[in-house]
Amino acid sequence: MQLAGKRALVMGLGVHGGGTGVARFLALQGADVTVTDLRGPDDLRASLDALAGLPIRFVLGEHRDDDFRRAEIVVRNPAVPPNSRYLQIARAAGATIEMEMTIFFRLCPGPILGVTGTKGKTTTTLLLGAMLREQFPDTVIAGNLRISALEQLPTITATTPVVLELSSFALEGLGEAGLSPKIACITTIAPDHLDRHGTMEAYILAKEQIWRHQRPGDAVALNADSPIIRAMAVVEQRPDDVVWFASAAHPALAHAGRAAFWQGDELVWRDHRGGRHVICTRDDVQLRGTHNLGNIAAATAAACSFGVAPDHIRRAVQTFPGVEHRLELVRELDGVRYVNDTAATAPEAAIAALRTFDDPIVLIAGGADKQLPFDDLAREIAGRVKAVVLVDGTATPKLQRALRLVDPSVDVCGPFDDFERAVIAARHIAAPGDIVLLSPGCASFGMFRNEFHRGEAFRRIVESFT
């Protein structure tokens, strides 16, 4: 892929550095780089500082049609929809449309393992990376983790495993380019990002791109617990390439080939000959929540498909501490535990968090709308939660209506347009033995830059309590 001397336009720098890695990479490859973003320099200060000193032209606060007409390569941020009118201008002028991930896939010399899913993909990606690093210490972990894959390229050889977290947005671009990883893994699928994809069918199709362009002999690890995933065409088209995983001995596994599943307290790997190998037990697991048993099985299925030895997998499970912003214990104060699960940006993820705890929960929920239903989350709240503190946002009225329909007696406080006041209100409601759980079930846009900004604010507020 020739980049030197090419007129390259990066569309969308991003407030948390989403485009800095590809902009830096293109500049260092000798491309004539322009970065364009609708946000102004004040909003993008951290990203601009990260690119200081590089020969990059910036067009901020607007997109200019002429920039798209003159570009030979346009690299779109995953947040930019593929049907953007600016991309249509670029295509009409003969430009190639890329994403950071498509460039990386074309240039990466090592084998790629990709993980996607509505929930569980970050934990599974990092755990899979830890499993591989036990056997292959040079393993690279990147993707949808605020870690630029392109910046890791100089360290990657033909034998370096690369583990990538792949969002549905990134997979759209990979699908257009006809690219899939050697080992693919789909953790779960439930409604999410329907504000972007429009329909559940379109969202599923985006997720399916992770396996649709694989080569013969590649593998795809699929969740037997999910009816949506079990119905995917790859199951009939390439049965020998499918590796199953499940949080229990699911009936769908009875006649399947390779599989990783929990049987009682043991995680079992069944190889292609039908041999049974105990990988670990529940006593080896540090992660909270039954949903994380599924994540461990998913990572195990992918790791075993790549040839990682059971002992290496066991060591990774025993030492894996979890992921920040996901069921993260911030502190315990006056007998109350404060748990940061800000990464739960969809109702399904918040439901999984609520099912993790047996103690009374004061839930902090609400936020920006992704066109998702809240009926199931409302039922879970009514059955499990001591009180819910609502944060203002475009989705919050939908959650309020769902709660009123399910159980008008649910103790609801708010909504608050000040996040600190919401956290303080939750503290006042909680009693010794309770859990204050930030698991919003919604996106964060409007009040915060992103969900991680929201989680950091929660940490800061809780750590300030005396």
Curated annotation (Swiss-Prot):
Give compartment(s): Cytoplasm
Annotated Gene Ontology cellular components are: cytoplasm
User: GO molecular-function annotation terms?
Assistant: ATP binding; UDP-N-acetylmuramoylalanine-D-glutamate ligase activity
Signal peptide bounds: none
Keywords per UniProt: ATP-binding, Cell cycle, Cell division, Cell shape, Cell wall biogenesis/degradation, Cytoplasm, Ligase, Nucleotide-binding, Peptidoglycan synthesis
Could you tell me what this protein does?
Cell wall formation. Catalyzes the addition of glutamate to the nucleotide precursor UDP-N-acetylmuramoyl-L-alanine (UMA).
Similarity section: Belongs to the MurCDEF family.
User: PANTHER family under this entry?
Assistant: UDP-N-ACETYLMURAMOYLALANINE--D-GLUTAMATE LIGASE
Under which name does UniProt file this protein?
UDP-N-acetylmuramoylalanine--D-glutamate ligase
Per UniProt, what is the name of the gene that codes for the protein in this document?
A: murD
